[in-house]
């Protein structure tokens, strides 16, 4: 038997995240106050969206800090799931906020209040500037850090919301159509809901230890089987500790003519890292399928001996 392990360490630009968080968090308060003073539901709904930016930035920072904490005897996998729990909470909170905004917009469409378009415009422009600065701060790190990239995309999407509010303020200023404010709030709410569902679904998938969305299980099975020295495999499991940190365990039945630890293991580890970005790998080698080969069917991840070369050949 043999086992292979490799570990990666998360990184990120903490300084950029801290500056972006300070800017976004400060303006979030200003936007809520501005929305209340100008009676603009569009501003308030955009502030709700900016709240997700603030939480996303905080999660990214927390994930970097927590990732530095070593695993202990109680949490042998470390503390990576904190990020996922926070993301799931963020999604549930967003659902509630978006539904409230849609309901409030429905009431306002029937009786639109007087909107202070000038104040609405000024606050939205300031929000646009804050988003542009935050994007600039995060742009350098978003290509190398998944956390920073997620925060960058949150800020980018909120920037579009600010543009919508600015357009609404201009329309109200020159036409007096107060209903436009509620209409824009509805659009922002409808835009946020699908993204919220995607975030919640992805979080639940990680918590349920499902196969990561960016990993093609069938292709992994195919590539394992194609590795020289592999006769078959079973008990294959792929899951993620957190976003971008996939793990894999598998039982491999190896050819008796090869040394599995010296010949097969390096090939499998290299292939999984290069093609699927799976770097935390545990492989058990066997000369014949163990008793867990039948039990593996209960997981429905890959039926026992789904990777037999005879089956693969018949499928071509």
UniProtKB/Swiss-Prot annotation:
The residues that cross the membrane are 17-37, 47-67, 82-102, 115-135, 152-172, 174-194
Name the major location.
Answer: membrane
Mutation: residue 5 to R; reported impact is: Decreases zinc resistance
- Is the Thylakoid keyword given for this protein? no
Q: Which SUPFAM superfamilies match?
A: Cation efflux protein cytoplasmic domain-like, Cation efflux protein transmembrane domain-like
What do mutants without this gene show?
Answer: Mutant is impaired in metal sensing. Deletion leads to partially constitutive expression of the Czc system due to an increased transcription of the czcCBA genes.
Result for mutant: residue 280 to A? Lack of zinc resistance
One Gene Ontology cellular component annotation held by this UniProt entry: plasma membrane
Q: Does the keyword Repeat apply?
A: no
Please indicate which superkingdom the organism of origin belongs to.
Bacteria
Name the InterPro entries on file.
Answer: Cation_efflux, Cation_efflux_CTD_sf, Cation_efflux_TMD_sf, CDF/SLC30A
Q: Characterize the regulation of its activity.
A: Efflux is inhibited by FCCP.
One GO molecular-function entry: zinc ion transmembrane transporter activity
In this entry, the parts of the chain located on the Cytoplasmic side of the membrane are 1-16, 68-81, 136-151, 195-316
Localization, per the record, is:
Cell inner membrane
Q: Which UniProt keywords apply?
A: Cadmium, Cadmium resistance, Cell inner membrane, Cell membrane, Cobalt, Ion transport, Membrane, Plasmid, Transmembrane, Transmembrane helix, Transport, Zinc, Zinc transport
Periplasmic membrane side: 38-46, 103-114
Query: How does the record say this protein sits in the membrane?
Result: Multi-pass membrane protein
Enumerate the Gene Ontology biological process terms: detoxification of zinc ion; response to cadmium ion
Inducing stimuli: Most highly expressed when the upstream czcCBA transcript is not induced.
UniProt xrefs under Pfam families:
Cation_efflux
Q: Which family does it belong to?
A: Belongs to the cation diffusion facilitator (CDF) transporter (TC 2.A.4) family. SLC30A subfamily.
Function description: Mediates a low-level metal ion resistance, probably by efflux of cations from the cytoplasm into the periplasm. Also mediates resistance to cobalt, cadmium and zinc via regulation of the Czc system. May repress expression of the Czc system by an export of the inducing cations. Binds and transports zinc. Can also bind cobalt, copper and nickel.
- Entry protein name: Metal cation efflux system protein CzcD
């Amino acid at each position: 038997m043999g086992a292979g392990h490799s570990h990666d360490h998360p990184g990120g630009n903490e300084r950029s995240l801290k500056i972006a968080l300070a800017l976004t968090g400060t303006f979030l308060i200003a936007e809520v106050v501005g929305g209340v003073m100008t009676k603009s539901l569009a501003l308030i709904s955009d502030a709700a969206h900016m709240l997700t930016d603030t939480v996303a930035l905080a999660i990214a920072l927390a994930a970097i800090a927590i990732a530095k904490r070593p695993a202990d005897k109680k949490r042998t996998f470390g503390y990576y799931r904190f990020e996922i729990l926070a993301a799931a909470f963020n999604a549930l909170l967003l659902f509630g906020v978006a539904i409230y905004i849609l309901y409030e917009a429905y009431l306002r469409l029937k009786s639109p209040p007087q909107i202070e378009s000038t104040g609405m415009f000024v606050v939205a422009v300031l929000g646009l500037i804050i988003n542009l600065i935050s994007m600039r701060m995060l742009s350098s790190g978003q290509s190398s850090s998944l956390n920073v990239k997620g925060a960058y995309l949150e800020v980018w999407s909120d920037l579009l919301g600010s543009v919508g509010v600015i357009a609404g303020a201009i329309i109200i200023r020159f036409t007096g159509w107060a209903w436009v404010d509620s209409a824009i709030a509805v659009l922002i709410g409808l835009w946020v809901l699908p993204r919220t569902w995607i975030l919640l679904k992805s979080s639940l998938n990680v918590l349920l230890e499902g196969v990561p969305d960016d990993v093609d299980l069938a292709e992994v099975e195919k590539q394992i089987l194609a590795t020289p020295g592999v006769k078959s495999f079973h008990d294959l499991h792929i899951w993620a500790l957190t976003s971008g940190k996939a793990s894999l365990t598998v039982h491999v039945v190896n050819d008796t003519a090869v040394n599995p630890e010296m010949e097969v293991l390096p090939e499998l580890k290299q292939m999984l890292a290069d093609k699927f970005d799976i770097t935390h790998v545990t492989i058990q080698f066997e000369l014949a399928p163990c008793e867990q080969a039948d039990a593996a069917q209960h997981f429905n991840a890959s039926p026992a001996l789904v990777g037999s070369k005879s089956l693969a050949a018949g499928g071509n």
